[in-house]
Swiss-Prot record:
Main location: host cell
Keyword Membrane among record annotations: yes
Keyword entries, A-Z: Host membrane, Membrane, Signal, Transmembrane, Transmembrane helix
Lipid bilayer topology: Single-pass membrane protein
Keyword Transmembrane helix: yes
Protein name, UniProt field: Non-structural protein 7
N-terminal signal peptide: 1-23
Organism: Porcine respiratory coronavirus (strain 86/137004 / isolate British) (PRCoV)
Superkingdom of the source species: Viruses
Length: 78
């Protein structure tokens, strides 16, 4: 039961991190209007790529944990 509770907590924290990354991505896109040099654009492009990669990784972790929670719940109910 404790393992299930930990998985649920980690799943919720993962969803919160995904939301924070989406907010960060929006803020970075809003600053794209203030770019003055090519270096600024390259830094912004790399930052956006990193946030998108982090979102993909966190979504994969979320799906794995969600599957684990469902599996554990089915085992407990049987």
């Amino acid at each position: 039961m404790l393992v299930l509770l930990q998985a649920v907590c980690i799943t919720v924290l993962t969803l919160l991190l995904i939301g924070r990354l989406q907010l960060l991505e929006r803020l970075l896109l809003n600053h794209s209007f203030n770019l003055k040099t090519v270096d600024d654009f390259n830094i912004l492009y790399r930052s956006l790529a990193e946030t998108r990669l982090l979102k993909v990784v966190l979504r994969l972790i979320f799906l794995v944990l969600l599957g684990f929670c469902c599996y554990r719940l089915l085992v407990i109910l049987m």
